[in-house]
């Protein structure tokens, strides 16, 4: 026999916010979702290259291994 009332509440019109603006509505177990990146501003979909680093990990890696942040990946791979 199945248990009753074990499933979370479902919100079929949950709003997804990015930078304070509603970007889409989806079905979710939460009424509102706040995201930093979505398909409208993701570098893969927009064709731009951007490093999203909120904790300074990229800079720490570059300092640790003596790389400058101005190098591109193509320049690093050349021998």
Curated annotation (Swiss-Prot):
One of its GO terms (cellular component) is ribonucleoprotein complex. GO terms for biological process: translation. GO terms for molecular function: rRNA binding; structural constituent of ribosome. InterPro entries: Ribosomal_bL28/bL31-like_sf, Ribosomal_bL31, Ribosomal_bL31_A, Ribosomal_bL31_sf. Keywords: Ribonucleoprotein, Ribosomal protein, RNA-binding, rRNA-binding. Binds the 23S rRNA. HAMAP family: Ribosomal_bL31_1. Part of the 50S ribosomal subunit. Belongs to the bacterial ribosomal protein bL31 family. Type A subfamily. This is Large ribosomal subunit protein bL31. It comes from Trichormus variabilis (strain ATCC 29413 / PCC 7937) (Anabaena variabilis). The gene is rpmE.
